[in-house]
Amino acid sequence: MKDFAIIYDLDQTILPAAAVPEETFLPIYEAIRSANQGTVPDEELEEALKKIRTVSMDVIAKEHNFSDAMKEAAKEAFLNRDYKFSCSPFDDWPVVKRIPGKRFLVTSGIPKLQQAKFDALFEEGDFDGIYVDNIYDENRLGKKRLFEKIAEEQGLIPDLIWIVGDNPDSEITAGNELGMKTVQIVRPGIEQSDKASYLICSFYELNDLVTKWEASLKFKA
């Protein structure tokens, strides 16, 4: 049988957003508040800051019309510091290691911050490849291009690649546009979408889904 791959998102898929200590983000909050200068109403700004744990900074800035000064303050605050903390994944993370197929991780964000999460969560060999979609990279590829890159490097057609994540407007949309199988994992607080090919609430369900699909391929072969 041919190889196949599963590409996982990180935040709100493997790692609860609340698992990263709040103090990690305090300097970022303060930098953005200081640069605001009345551009965004205080109440709206506080709502925007609450999203930093779960939503990419570039998306937040666009949605709430951050000024250039606010964007630059956020960028400097994110980039000019080191990160180290302890955090724990969702309880069903160990199930991922039992699910058939090659495993890849693709996550958007700040490389140093995402690396701190990797260091706290993963062991060597947990994934066949890890990719960070760096939101501040001038030559940013984006998740869609990274998915294509993995497919090309692994010699896999889209139908043999699964995309698993929580965000229907990010990894799910990218996977759909490439003709890959998409699975939205609906963690607590995540709104269910009709964009994905499949809906699950845990990796136990993903294991059942992929195992049955793999068995059907073997049967056809």
Q: What is the role of each PLM region?
A:
Residues M1-D42:
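Active-site neighborhood of HAD-like aspartate-dependent phosphohydrolases
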Residues M1-F4, F104, I110-A221:
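Asp-based, Mg2+/Mn2+-dependent phosphohydrolase catalytic module
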Residues Q12-P16, E46-E47, I135-D137:
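Short histidine/acidic/glycine/proline-rich micro-motifs that form metal-
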Residues L15, E44, L105-V106, I163:
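Short catalytic-loop micro-motif centered on adjacent basic/acidic residues
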Residues P21-E30, R53-D58, P111, Q115:
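An amphipathic alpha-helix signature
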Residues R33-S34, E46-R81:
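A metal-dependent, Asp-based hydrolase signature
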Residues L45-L49, A61, D92-K102, L121, ...:
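Alpha-helix C-terminal capping segments
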Residues N80-L105, K144:
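Short, acidic loop-to-helix structural element flanking the phosphoryl-transfer center
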